[in-house]
């Protein structure tokens, strides 16, 4: 899960006074589109993924989206936020791990949340992950409905190339997931049908 990793509570950029321009970036993605992705560690450069689902997350400061993308039996999950900068992460691992697997405890997470300091960090498998944010979040499945609450902690690996997100849903154990930070221009979007006039699928 993804928010303002490189700064806390930064405001979203406004739309320019001249009106929105044609946007072929991930910002304009919709269910039914197709995308390709380059630069992911597991090398899917020659694969084309169908965007099957789009979920939305939001807290007081930011909104971000999670795409479920499929190509045959292969799934990838792409998160993106457009707060201060367009920031994108991706993973092909659907299975979270528990806190014990990464050497953390609930008490440590509570302390990190209360201290709320980006000077804090944790070590996972000998690698440093810097604390970036923690907050209560609303999850909107398929970008609809009233939303379901959860709590999230985000940590960014020291080199800025990997994100660790830890979530806590009511009635469920803590879940930790890893994803890879990728350049926004490494994703090429092939738009499907649009309901508004003048929209065409890029060649």
State each model region's role.
Residues 1-203:
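Mixed-charge, low-complexity intrinsically disordered regions
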